[in-house]
């Protein structure tokens, strides 16, 4: 199935990402949750025809999750031997692929310094488990994504941040958003789509004012909502896709108020 490409009314977002990629710069995509950062990375991967290896960061991320680990394997002679299975970082370096580090500021600060040599001019790393020195082959690039201010995130270490060039990725809107809804959801009714876009604009405003979380206004939640509207009333669809995900009753009530104003 063909990849649904990233779209944005600001063409400089993708064009600059492509230019930085061509210059072999580390790219840091910075923006609210659900704004399309991963979709942008996937689109870039397809456009340059280079596979992408993804790391999903969390507080549980460790060096083995990045680099790989030792395991026991039975060889052709039936004997057991210890082998090292490459992780996403080493795979991407050896194969000249893209390394995508999602939500990089969710990782514990002490986990990431192992990547310093990967991210600077050296483009190499010494595998602490095997002693092998791996130097990235041509084609290797690094893209990372960050959700600033999101629950559970930590400020990025300045030494790490300085290894990236930043591109801000904001939510899409207007005709671009309308086209994305038609292409990526089941909802095709123009009048309903216009209502949903207006509702989403209200959610984004509330999110910027701190009344609700960013996830409630995300494109992911919006597309889920559009799908559900085709099989149930809009109010119930909003409850299933947005309201019931929220723990704070004040956030829930703020969205109920927005529903009353828009539908």
From Swiss-Prot:
SUPFAM superfamilies xref list: P-loop containing nucleoside triphosphate hydrolases
Q: Which InterPro entries match?
A: ATPase_dyneun-rel_AAA, CbbQ/NirQ/NorQ/GpvN, CbbQ_C, ClpA/B, P-loop_NTPase
Kinase listed as a keyword: no
**For binding ATP, which residues are annotated in this chain's numbering?**
31-38
Where does the source fall among the domains of life? Bacteria
- A Pfam family of this chain: CbbQ_C
| GO terms of molecular function | ATP binding; ATP hydrolysis activity
Which intervals of the chain form a coiled coil? none
Alphabetic keyword roster: ATP-binding, Nucleotide-binding
Q: Which family does it belong to?
A: Belongs to the CbbQ/NirQ/NorQ/GpvN family.
Q: Which PANTHER family match?
A: MAGNESIUM-CHELATASE SUBUNIT CHLD, MOXR FAMILY PROTEIN
Report the protein name in the record. Answer: Uncharacterized protein SAB1265c
Q: What is the species of this protein?
A: Staphylococcus aureus (strain bovine RF122 / ET3-1)
């Amino acid at each position: 199935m063909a990849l649904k490409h990233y779209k944005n009314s600001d063409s400089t977002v993708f064009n600059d990402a492509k230019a930085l990629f061509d210059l072999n710069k580390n790219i840091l995509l910075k923006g609210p949750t659900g704004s399309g950062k991963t979709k942008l990375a996937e689109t870039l991967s397809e456009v340059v025809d280079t596979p992408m290896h993804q790391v999903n960061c969390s507080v549980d991320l460790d060096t083995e999750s990045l680099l790989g680990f030792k395991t026991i394997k039975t060889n052709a002679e039936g004997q057991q031997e210890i082998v090292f299975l490459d992780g996403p970082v080493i795979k991407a370096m050896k194969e000249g692929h893209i390394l995508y580090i999602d939500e990089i500021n969710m990782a514990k600060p002490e986990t990431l310094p192992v990547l310093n040599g990967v991210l600077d001019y050296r483009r190499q790393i010494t595998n602490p488990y095997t002693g092998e020195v791996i130097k990235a082959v041509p084609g290797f690039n690094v893209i990372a994504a960050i959700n600033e201010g999101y629950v559970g995130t930590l400020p990025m270490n300045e030494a790490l941040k300085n290894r990236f060039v930043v591109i801000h990725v904001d939510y899409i809107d207007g005709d671009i958003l309308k086209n994305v809804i038609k292409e990526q959801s089941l909802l095709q009714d123009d009048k309903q789509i216009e209502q949903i876009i207006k509702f989403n604009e209200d959610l984004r405003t509330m999110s910027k004012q701190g009344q609700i979380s960013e996830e409630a206004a995300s494109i992911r939640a919006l597309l889920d909502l559009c799908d559900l509207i085709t099989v149930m009333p809009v109010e119930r669809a909003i409850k299933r896709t947005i309201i019931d995900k929220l723990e704070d009753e004040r956030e829930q009530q703020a969205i109920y108020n927005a529903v009353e104003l828009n539908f």
